[in-house]
């Protein structure tokens, strides 16, 4: 094997170098062949191994022929397999033909009627027919009267509804239309008396009926009457105070020790309880 490769790579002058590729390649191949020779010389086809493991061809010849069909009778015949009892019962039930139910006719016993019984039977039949005819006549006459009464009731109800609707549409005497629309300012001036001080709408008193229709807010005259004779206090305007502060006028020398009480509304009646206001 090494000689074949060495012959093809002998001319080393073709590659332009002194290195001989053929010699190195052949030496490597010979060493590899030498190593693998030991494995190649081993004998795997021993008699003991072949006897325990038969070849595949023996199995193929046993279960198949040239056409590829199975030759085993037990595997080919599926009917030979055991079947459970319930399966056998199902198969036998399916094999039966459906049967139609037979109807048994039983003849009723015939009774022999005598002449007296026949006459009684016929008379009863005639009485029943006459009663039915009478009932039909009475039933036919009643619906006509009831229909007329229902029509009268419907007409009466319709007339009542029309009368009620016309009464609703007419102007009721309780609610009269508003003739004049008064402004808020005029209403507040009438209630309060001083239009410039209070321009807010007067709140409605919830229990005004219980209190006798008390107007709210109360007028200044009513407050004075309830409060009694109040002491006339001197009024200080803010403009006067500002003017005095700007000019720097000081009148402390003219004032007495009790002057500040009268100036800021603290008179001789401060701290005293007037009992005439209490009931």
Swiss-Prot record:
Ranges of Low complexity composition bias in the record: 1-29, 45-59, 170-186
Annotated segments matching region Disordered: 1-111, 137-233
Biased composition range(s): Basic and acidic residues: 30-44, 221-233
Gene Ontology CC terms, in alphabetical order: striated muscle dense body; striated muscle thin filament
Amino acid composition bias (Acidic residues), ranges on this chain: 142-153
Protein name according to UniProt: Uncharacterized protein F15G9.1
Domain of life (superkingdom): Eukaryota
Ranges of Polar residues composition bias in the record: 189-205
UniProt organism field: Caenorhabditis elegans
Lineage, top ranks: Eukaryota, Metazoa, Ecdysozoa, Nematoda, Chromadorea
């Amino acid at each position: 094997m090494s000689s074949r490769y060495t012959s093809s790579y002998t001319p080393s002058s073709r590659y332009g170098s002194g290195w001989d590729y053929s010699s190195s390649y052949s030496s490597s191949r010979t060493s590899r062949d030498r190593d693998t020779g030991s494995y190649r010389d081993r004998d795997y086809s021993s008699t003991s191994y072949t006897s325990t493991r038969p070849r595949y061809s023996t199995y193929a010849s046993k279960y198949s022929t040239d056409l590829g069909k199975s030759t085993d009778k037990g595997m080919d015949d599926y009917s030979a397999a055991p079947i459970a009892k319930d399966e056998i019962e199902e198969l036998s039930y399916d094999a039966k033909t459906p049967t139609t139910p037979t109807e048994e006719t039983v003849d009723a016993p015939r009774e022999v009627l005598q002449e007296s019984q026949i006459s009684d039977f016929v008379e009863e039949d005639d009485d029943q027919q006459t009663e039915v005819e009478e009932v039909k006549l009475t039933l036919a006459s009643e619906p006509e009267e009831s229909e007329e009464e229902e029509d009268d009731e419907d007409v009466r109800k319709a007339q009542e509804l029309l009368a009620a609707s016309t009464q609703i549409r007419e102007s009721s005497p309780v609610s009269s239309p508003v003739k004049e629309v008064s402004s808020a300012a005029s209403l507040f001036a009438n209630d309060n008396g001083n239009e410039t001080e209070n321009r807010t709408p007067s709140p409605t008193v919830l229990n005004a009926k219980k209190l006798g229709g008390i107007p709210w807010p109360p007028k200044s005259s009513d407050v004075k009457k309830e409060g009694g004779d109040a002491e006339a206090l001197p009024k200080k305007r803010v403009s006067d105070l500002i003017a005095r502060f700007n000019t720097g006028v000081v009148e402390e020398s003219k004032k007495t020790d009790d002057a500040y009480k009268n100036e800021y509304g603290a008179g001789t009646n401060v701290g005293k309880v007037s009992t005439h206001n209490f009931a």
